[in-house]
Amino acid sequence: MALERSDVEKIAHLARLGLNDADIPRTTEALNSILGLVDQMQAVDTTGIEPLAHPLEATQRLREDAVTERNRRDTYQAIAPAVQDGLYLVPKVIE
């Protein structure tokens, strides 16, 4: 699947990227190259191959899950600009 100029323009718009006309051909080529690599990887037969979570068979030593600090929620919320029902109120950032 090859991307066309209109596809790249739409992707740039959705990603809120400001691409100028000079950048679009280079970006189209780069994205098509990435998609070509994805196509190559999808074509590989992985039947019988167990998924790999980590290349090393090492495990981490885990500490006991215990509270190590006191709850300072009230202290932090006292200096917050806006709090309601124990939650921080922030400006809306998504339209």
Swiss-Prot record:
Source taxon at top rank: Bacteria
UniProt-listed Enzyme Commission number(s): 6.3.5.-
High-level lineage: Bacteria, Pseudomonadati, Pseudomonadota, Gammaproteobacteria, Pseudomonadales
InterPro entries: Asp/Glu-ADT_sf_sub_c, GatC
Organism encoding this protein: Pseudomonas syringae pv. tomato (strain ATCC BAA-871 / DC3000)
Gene: gatC
Protein name: Aspartyl/glutamyl-tRNA(Asn/Gln) amidotransferase subunit C
Any one GO MF annotation of this record: ATP binding
Keywords: ATP-binding, Ligase, Nucleotide-binding, Protein biosynthesis
UniProt xrefs under SUPFAM superfamilies: Glu-tRNAGln amidotransferase C subunit (SSF141000)
